[in-house]
Amino acid sequence: MSQCPNCGHQVKDDTSQCPNCGQLLTKKKKRKIKDQSSQSSNENSTNIRLRKIVPIGISVFILILIIVLFFLLRNYNSPNAQAKILVNAVDNNDSQKVATLLSTKNKKVDDVEAQQYINYVKKEVGIKKYIRDINNTVDKLNKSNSSVASYIQTKSGQDVLKISKNGTKYLIFDNMSFTAPTKKPIIKPKVETKYEFRTSGKKKTVIAEANKNTPLGEFIPGTYHLPAKKITENGTFNGHLNFDFRESHSETVDVAEDYDQSFINIKFKGANKLSDKSEKVQINDRTFTYSHSKEFGPYPKTKDITISATGKAKGKTFSSETKTISADDLKDNTKVTLEFDSDKINSYVEKKEKEENSLKNKLTEFFTGYATAMNSAFNMNDFNFISSYFKKNSSIYTSMKSNFQNRTNVTMISPQVLSVHRNGHTVRTTIQHIDHIGNYINKDYELEIDNDDSNMQLVKEL
């Protein structure tokens, strides 16, 4: 069979005219038609073969692509690949990469911490041992069905890395989690202090109360010399906070301050007559209760310090000399002696003691008469016997009068004056006496006294 060159109709080889269109078919044309038909048949056969080969080729290409993808994923996502990324970062001091790898949802590690970690690992573990221990641990966990975490440790047994299984990646590879254990640096300042420093890539402020343990946050293993500003009521200091995981205790590590600061130790001279409870020191613009064993500060070594003191003797306040310590003379522990005018203090104390002895004698006479009058008044139930000893309408006057009305007996036997303190027309005294059942009783009273000490009256019982 061949095709008509005019209409394409199939005609027999021995036909001289196309039955469809009437086209005359010569031998030459029939040969051409035959050749064309043969060519068409060959093309059809080729197309059939191509249609069979193309799907196979595509399948082979996809298979090769899958194999390549698998190896790529394995190179970057298998447990061994994950371990290799970490150890290479540590080995090459790539603090930025280490910070990224060790950061977690709850703890962001910054470049500074990461570099401290790298230095610590290389010094306390050794990079070769660190790499070997990680690879051995990963292989062991990879072959095990256990989900129990393993730890990489220093030579002294401190944990520096936790390795644990954390599900799978792409449903094929075990996912390993690499985290650095954290501890809390603890600081205990002598005074309330505010610390400002950077951690986890941002500024942090911690306020620590005096003599109380205060955590600075969470840090990964390292030996830290952390730049930090320290602010107290005495001034602002620039320095460092130092803490070393080699000296840690369980979950905490102690912090040592490293600041250019001075503590002041103050001693008094010529102050033996002053009342201990009244003694105070003034440092710059702040006043403190004084104790000979107390250490004052810290103060910055960059500024002069002005120091003075006060104390009371027999109710009068005396001041010491004022000293200014220049910044150049400030040491870590600076000793200062403040001198009082002992002659002036002693003279005043001697004068007041004479007055007090005179007043004490008068009070002894007053309370002896008061005790006798009170006992007689209660025996006779007559308040008028003792009313002159009280200031009229004072609290003790009203109270004692009520005792008579209620027939409540009050007894005072053998009164003795233990102490006296006078302030103008007001006298406060402590009296010891025996009550009605023989017990010694101490009572404090306040009295009013006139200018020439000739008359005094009870105002209240303290």
From Swiss-Prot:
GO terms for cellular component: plasma membrane. Keywords: Antibiotic resistance, Cell membrane, Membrane, Metal-binding, Transmembrane, Transmembrane helix, Zinc, Zinc-finger. One of its GO terms (molecular function) is zinc ion binding. InterPro entries: Mem_prot_TcaA, TcaA_2nd, TcaA_4th, Zinc_ribbon_dom. Residues 74-462 are extracellular. It is a single-pass membrane protein. Residues 1-52 are cytoplasmic. It comes from the Bacteria. GO terms for biological process: response to antibiotic. Belongs to the TcaA family. PANTHER family: MEMBRANE-ASSOCIATED PROTEIN TCAA. This is Membrane-associated protein TcaA. It comes from Staphylococcus epidermidis (strain ATCC 35984 / DSM 28319 / BCRC 17069 / CCUG 31568 / BM 3577 / RP62A). The gene is tcaA.
